[in-house]
Amino acid sequence: MASNLVKFHSSFQFKLNTTSSLSFLGSKQQLNNLYHSIFFTKPKSDFSPLQCSLSSPTPPITKEDAVSQAKFSLSTTLEKPLNNPKLIGKIKKLKQPRFRVEIPVVDDSPSALAQLAFDIFGEMPIKRKAPNIKILLLWPNQTLTQAAQAEFEKKKSSNPIIENLDISSRIEISADVVVFMAPEASILTVMKEISDTLYPMPVVIFNPKWGFDEESSFGELSGFVGSFEVVYSFMGLEVRGILSNRKGVMFKCVKDGVLSGEKWYVFVEEDGELKVVSRFKARPSIVEVENVLYNLMAVNSPITKSAKFLKDLVSNVRGKK
């Protein structure tokens, strides 16, 4: 397989081993204009986050669109467990609601991540019979925690109640939902301990710092990480061809809080619009995505088309079909 065929545009600092033919782009220069110019040369004006509810999901055009979609997917997914806490507690073996959200960002500075946290959770439209949902955001270090506290104090959120804490804080956690913000692999053990303590209340991983293909190397913690169901994920990619490059995206967006049956979609730009080229029931590995895009580029390459034309020409001359 050709090397460096595909490049992923990501904010999550995904890392790959040296044997992989994919490389993730992480700098501000590489991620510049991620949402607009990379994905659409013909922007659509009728975008709505509710398009996650349609049979054919629509990837976001701008960062604001991605935030709106992610907020809609997560809030509707959280509504069921938050509105039925007594039912959850009565069933001992019921699975703890664990969700995961991934939104690429150009700027991963403390102030930018704090702004993103407010955009997602500050005005999250969760429908609940009881008022004042409390969401606890756990940050991996004190710097991020302080930035988030300053952001939420500056922009008062009406609902829900938000609290920002350092994950290393030795205090009793009390909340309706706990979110691990931009966690690193080094704190997975602590995350598992907290999640087990909070059972059966919902927990969320938001923008993990590790890559999906790294998770198989987490040992006993691989199962813990894998127990978080992705409700929203959006990753840009670039397909490198012989004569030109093509742009696309890997995308998942849960519809109306229904997790079962939601697929992962791979889109590639064609004639200024993104079109679905593959669907996966489970999250595809880097190699699987590369295979799909490699085959697509091979089929559409001038060399392949010329070879097919010559083969058809010879068949016609010989009277064969």
Describe the function of each predicted region.
Residues 5-27, 278, 289-321:
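Long C-terminal extensions of eukaryotic subunits of large macromolecular complexes
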Residues 42-190, 197-199, 306-321:
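Positively charged, amphipathic N-terminal segments that serve as targeting/anchoring signals
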Residues 194-196, 220:
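A structural signal for leucine-rich repeat
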